[in-house]
Amino acid sequence: MSARKRTAAIVGVYNTRQGRRLDGETSRSLALEAVHGALDDAGIELDSVDGITSGELSTTLIYDLRLGPAWQGFGFGLGMITEAAAAIENGLAEAVVLVAAQAGEYREHEATAPWTRPENEFVASWGMFTAAEFALIARRHMHVYGTTREQLSIVAATIRNNGARNPEAVYYQRGPFVPDDITASRPIADPFHLLDCATTSEGGCALVVANVEKFDVARPPVYVLGSGFDFYGPSYQHPPAWDLTGRSGTDPNGVVGRRAADLAFAHAGLDRDEVDVLELYDPFSFEIIRQLEAFRFCPDGDGGPFVADGHIAIDGSHPVTTDGGTMSFSHAGTNPQMMQRAIRAVQQLRGTAGPLQVPDAHIALCSNGGAGAMFTTVLLLGDQPR
């Protein structure tokens, strides 16, 4: 007879200071700070940790923190959380730290960002840089459905205004913004202007996923209810065509994440109208409109009017990216920015999101990726197990 699965939950979260440039810090120093901060938040001792996921830093941190022998995960972004929860539920670990950080690795902005290498350095020189890849998807949607430039600006202004009210954001008190401010910034890749795009910054973060039946944790647990993962290929190597499909011929890259969202909701046993807050990944303004459609919060082609009607505002029916996201809160490399969607969701579900708290938040949806990167991942979190 197989052993009964244990209950895994996110029990600790921590963001280091985020900044455009954190002089005196390294990726390793920020990672160590984040580990200790998340464990303190969870009320779990370092001696109890028997698993870690931190990309290329994983084995370094296992050695530095004397965690071995320990389980090591290999996921990235939101996938780190699903992987850790599965490891705990199946007896491979009891307490797993997920950590990511970046400082001092991207200060020569004439070069491609290190987290897009080696792929982007071979295509960016021909004009296919990240903004252009996402712009291709946006322009196609605008052509087919009539999505307007103003609707993109509403998304960017909404998220940047969230960041302006978040004391932990890199761009705290930068704002408020109105849609005209977005198009007044310099053009980057049609239809995007500078303020449609993610910033670049430095910082670190960590989460603790643990067996809640074993630990007396300090904070209310947040449970993984469902997840889904859609990939169409490697990011930043090929033009991200809207119509790209796999052998099944269904759900083209333009709606990548639809299958992932359907799976996540099926696993969770939830309907879309039960979600209280959407911590959507926001590399560029249009990606929010695309995800709202792909995840079936509105019909295809209705994403633009949906945001124009105020649904994504902090006091709207579907508040999005409530910390300011990669546009305003932080964008410190591949894993920090992606993990921070889940960290913000945990803060909302705990009721600790400060001036940007969504009232009575019990269910949150998080996302990573986008059609320009040819993948989208989805995670549903709740303040109660299901």
Name each model-derived stretch.
Residues 1-83, 87, 141-148, 170-171, ...:
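Conserved active-site "lid/cap" helical segment
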Residues 1-28, 154, 187-255, 259, ...:
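Condensing-enzyme catalytic core mediating Claisen C-C bond formation in acyl metabolism
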Residues 4-5, 51-133, 173-197, 230-234, ...:
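Conserved catalytic cysteine-centered active-site region
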Residues 15-17, 55-58, 76-77, 100-105, ...:
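Acidic, glycine-rich active-site loops and adjacent beta-strand->loop/helix elements
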Residues 46-55, 96-101, 150-158, 219-229, ...:
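Beta-strand segments within the central parallel beta-sheet cores of soluble alpha/beta enzyme folds
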Residues 58-65, 236-240, 282-305, 316, ...:
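Short glycine/threonine-rich loop-to-helix capping motif typified by GTGT followed
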Residues 73-102, 115, 131-168, 207-214, ...:
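Active-site-proximal alpha-helical scaffold in enzymes
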Residues 245-306, 317-322, 339, 343:
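C-terminal catalytic subdomain
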